[in-house]
Amino acid sequence: MNKKHQVASLTINSSIFLTVLVAIIVTIGRSVRAQYYVNPEVTWMDFFYYTDITNIVLWVASICMIIIVSMQIHNKKTYKSFKGFYIFKFISVVGTTFTFLFVFLIFFPLGEINEKYKEVSMYNGIQIITHIIAPLLGLFGFVFTEYCPTNKKWTYTLPLVEMFVYMLILIPLVVTGVYEKYSCTHWESPYPFTNFMSNPWWATILYMIFCYGLTLGIGAGIYFSNYAAFTKLYVQDTNAKKHKIKNNK
């Protein structure tokens, strides 16, 4: 990244840090209120929404990037020194982009039909942060200001790990009824269509295939867009350096 990209990255990651922090504080406050004033059995199951988890991961990634970019500005270190953190940021961005598209394509239209889905609409309370602001800041910031080039093209499949771990934790909680018992909403699962006990087995499989497929598609799109942008910038920087050396001779 050149100085312009570094400053832009620092600004965007700082914005992500502040906006998601607000969402986290509000969510914690809501859970505390539910536990102490509504139902003492209520715990922190609201944090098992994929939206909340991916936003927290993005928040952590933004903190890492603020530190890394600041070090790059002052110490002139290259991306190679922090390649793993850039890949972590990539994974977090795919996760929040997934939630943005999922809500936009499914929950937003359903919210106009069913009152139950209005709670997760894109414009309701802090959802505007977790469903719109943070995902878009993360997406545009990563694609246009942060580059994690690698010759290993399978890197775009890494976001599947985040989705897999979420499913690995969610399914047992739903099947055993733990989520329904301790969540603030007392829904059977974080999302109605993820209720693996009520839904037909084939519906569950189709849902999982859709989620994995969408994650893979988003990962490929973001990765190769990022890679193309980096390649173009690298060629420009290389040509500029060659031109400078030639003029100095």
Regions found by a protein language model. Name each.
Residues 17-35:
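Alpha-helical transmembrane segments of multi-pass membrane proteins
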